[in-house]
From Swiss-Prot:
Reactions catalysed: 1-(5-phospho-beta-D-ribosyl)-5-[(5-phospho-beta-D-ribosylamino)methylideneamino]imidazole-4-carboxamide = 5-[(5-phospho-1-deoxy-D-ribulos-1-ylimino)methylamino]-1-(5-phospho-beta-D-ribosyl)imidazole-4-carboxamide
Gene of this entry: hisA
Descriptive protein name: 1-(5-phosphoribosyl)-5-[(5-phosphoribosylamino)methylideneamino] imidazole-4-carboxamide isomerase
Its EC number(s): 5.3.1.16
Pfam families per record: His_biosynth
InterPro entries, per the entry: Aldolase_TIM, His_biosynth, HisA_bact_arch, Isoase_HisA-like, Isoase_HisA-like_bact, RibuloseP-bd_barrel
Catalytic residues in the record: D8 (proton acceptor), D131 (proton donor)
Cellular-component GO terms for this entry: cytoplasm
Disulfide bonds: none
GO biological process: L-histidine biosynthetic process; L-tryptophan biosynthetic process
Compartments (UniProt record): Cytoplasm
Native source species: Burkholderia orbicola (strain MC0-3)
Length: 251
């Protein structure tokens, strides 16, 4: 089970939003590269970056901070990034800079042809971010709810060749209410590619619950507010996940 610390970037700083609201941002660090180093030193095996300004602007807006993070830890672990990725040129720029994966969200839903082209051009590097509320997909920084069912879109995108899916339950994100395990497992069982859970992770119990369903295709979980607020000790959580995985592997 991959525990993936999130570094959300707004105006070059590391912040956390409450339910995607740019006006409800808490600044946790003015040095995102140092934050990345901290998580890697604590045992992170992948990092999840979000260009929040980019998500709303539709183009890269935190390039300097992203490059600083990649310079700091990019040679050590894979780094993935979402937010504002709307063109093949942007993807190419990011992958050339050292990102391992880019996450396409809104653009995948609104312009499936773009996603298809991206999967063809950058095979193995494209992750789809599906944000949903009550099983329906949301777009545009969660501000618009579509009529699309998550599972239907996930199956379609799997056919295009996406590497994995980051699934966010937006009713729970930043609220420390616990991961929506049932919805995550349902999605993972419906597709043959890995699913990464996101939104609502609050404590060690969530990690233990996710480890129990890893065999269904839940590859990891994005750790956001809980590791910044102190509700979850990241190093202890990764250690516990590794212990559980060892127990499950030996069972």
């Amino acid at each position: 089970m991959l525990l993936i610390p999130a570094i959300d970037l707004k105006d070059g700083q590391c912040v956390r939003l409450k339910q995607g609201d740019m006006d409800q941002a808490t600044i946790f660090s003015e040095d995102p590269a140092a934050m990345a180093r901290k998580w890697v030193d604590l045992g992170a095996r992948r990092l999840h970056l979000v260009d929040l300004n980019g998500a709303f602007a539709g183009k890269p807006k935190n390039l300097e901070a992203i490059e600083a993070i990649l310079d700091e830890v990019g040679d050590e672990i894979p780094v993935q990034l979402g937010g504002g990725i709307r063109s093949l040129e942007t993807i190419e720029k990011y992958l050339d800079a050292g990102l391992s994966y880019v996450i396409i969200g809104t653009a995948a839903v609104k312009n499936p042809g773009f996603l298809q082209d991206a999967c063809t051009a950058f095979s193995g590097s494209i992750i789809v971010g599906l944000d949903a509320k009550d099983g329906k997909v949301a777009t545009d920084g969660w501000s618009k709810l579509t009529g699309h069912e998550v599972i239907d879109l996930a199956k379609k995108f799997e056919d295009y060749g996406v590497e994995s899916i980051v699934y966010t339950d937006i009713g729970r994100d930043g609220m420390l209410q616990g991961i929506n395990i049932d919805a995550t497992v349902k999605l993972a069982q419906a597709v043959g590619i890995p699913v990464i859970a996101s939104g609502g992770l609050s404590n060690l119990t969530d990690i233990e619950s996710l480890c129990e369903v890893e065999e269904h295709g839940v590859e990891g979980v994005i750790c956001g507010r809980a590791i910044y607020s102190g509700d979850l000790d990241f190093a202890a959580a990764q250690k516990r996940a590794d212990e559980l995985n060892g127990e499950l592997d030996n069972a």
